[in-house]
């Protein structure tokens, strides 16, 4: 039997900014039909990897493949029909309303010279309802709080209706209740609609509870990957973060729960 190949994958990637290399010879797959959480300390290459997989950045070496084709061979609009991206610190394009921002998620689906369609309207409405921002539809994005603005950007990605969604720190700026709302929504999209999701998450316990697959990075290298129950150990957390901890079962979800005990001595953390 032939082993299936993930729709989105990178092979032997060298990533960086100018002369600064973040990752070298990195090969990674985003497994189809999974909710993948990318974890690791600050500066380990999580966001850079996500930006490269979405074609927002070009690797210095190596290739990103989407549906069996080199991602650079696709037109930008075609990539946007297949991959939705929530970038970190996204900049609002001018003074527009929340509804106008969310509607931009429909642009990849609109043929040239075609007017706004019923399915576009329905997608925008559903996305705003799912993120709880319907009441903000006519408000300028510039007047929103950080959390409200983040939810508007997430709604735009949802309105794009792509089978693959990449989200860079989607819970940033959100209070705890909206963090859980968002993660529950993403988990539902994955379980019930088969969306392939990859998100950079800093909260390890949220990553373990909601993601079905983890990719753990340290210094631009994949240290471990797999289901949370299979890979999350006290040894792994200490190796990645230099943090001593206990791993217990989450009393609600049964997933690994990280209980911090304190920092490891620098010589141990860097070994």
Curated annotation (Swiss-Prot):
Q: What is the topology of this protein in the membrane according to its UniProt annotation?
A: Peripheral membrane protein
Q: Is ATP-binding there in the keyword field? A: yes
The terms describing its cellular component in GO are: ATP-binding cassette (ABC) transporter complex, substrate-binding subunit-containing; membrane; plasma membrane
Residues reported to bind ATP: 40-47
Would I find Translocase among this entry's keywords?
yes
Which reaction does this chain catalyze?
Answer: Fe(III)-enterobactin(out) + ATP + H2O = Fe(III)-enterobactin(in) + ADP + phosphate + H(+)
Where is this chain primarily localised? Answer: membrane
- ABC transporter domain location is 8-244
UniProt keyword list = ATP-binding, Cell inner membrane, Cell membrane, Ion transport, Iron, Iron transport, Membrane, Nucleotide-binding, Translocase, Transport
Q: What is its EC number?
A: 7.2.2.17
Which InterPro entries did the record assign? AAA+_ATPase, ABC_transporter-like_ATP-bd, ABC_transporter-like_CS, P-loop_NTPase, Siderophore_ABC-ATPase
Top EC group: translocase
GO terms of biological process kind: ferric-enterobactin import into cell; iron import into cell
Highest rank taxon of the organism? Bacteria
Q: Which Pfam families match?
A: ABC_tran
Described purpose of this protein according to its UniProt entry: Part of the ABC transporter complex FepBDGC involved in ferric enterobactin uptake. Responsible for energy coupling to the transport system.
Quaternary state and interactors: The complex is composed of two ATP-binding proteins (FepC), two transmembrane proteins (FepD and FepG) and a solute-binding protein (FepB).
Name it.
Ferric enterobactin transport ATP-binding protein FepC
Q: Please name the gene that encodes this protein.
A: fepC
């Amino acid at each position: 039997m032939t082993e299936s190949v993930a729709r989105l994958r990178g092979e032997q990637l060298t990533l960086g900014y100018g002369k600064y290399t973040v990752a070298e010879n990195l090969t990674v797959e985003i497994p189809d039909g999974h909710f993948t959480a990318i974890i690791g300390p600050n500066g380990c290459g999580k966001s850079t990897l996500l930006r490269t997989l979405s074609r927002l950045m070009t690797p210095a070496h190596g290739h990103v493949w989407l549906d069996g084709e080199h991602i650079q061979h696709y037109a930008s609009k075609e990539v946007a029909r297949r991959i939705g991206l929530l970038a970190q610190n996204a900049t609002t394009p001018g003074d527009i309303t929340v509804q106008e921002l969310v509607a931009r998620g429909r642009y990849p689906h609109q043929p040239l010279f075609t007017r706004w369609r019923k399915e576009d309207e329905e997608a925008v409405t559903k996305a705003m309802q799912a993120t709880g921002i319907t009441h903000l539809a006519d408000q300028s994005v510039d007047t929103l709080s950080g959390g409200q603005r983040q939810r508007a950007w997430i709604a735009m990605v949802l309105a794009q209706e792509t089978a693959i969604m990449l989200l860079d720190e989607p819970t940033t700026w959100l209070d705890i209740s909206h963090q859980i709302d968002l993660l529950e929504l993403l988990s539902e999209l994955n379980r019930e609609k088969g969306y392939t999701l990859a998100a950079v998450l800093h909260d390890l316990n949220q990553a373990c509870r909601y993601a079905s697959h983890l990719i753990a990075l340290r210094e631009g290298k994949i240290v471990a990957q797999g289901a949370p129950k299979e890979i999350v150990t006290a040894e792994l957390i200490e190796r990645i973060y230099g943090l001593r901890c206990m791993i217990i079962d989450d009393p609600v979800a049964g997933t690994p729960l990280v209980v911090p005990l304190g920092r490891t001595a620098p010589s141990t953390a860097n070994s």
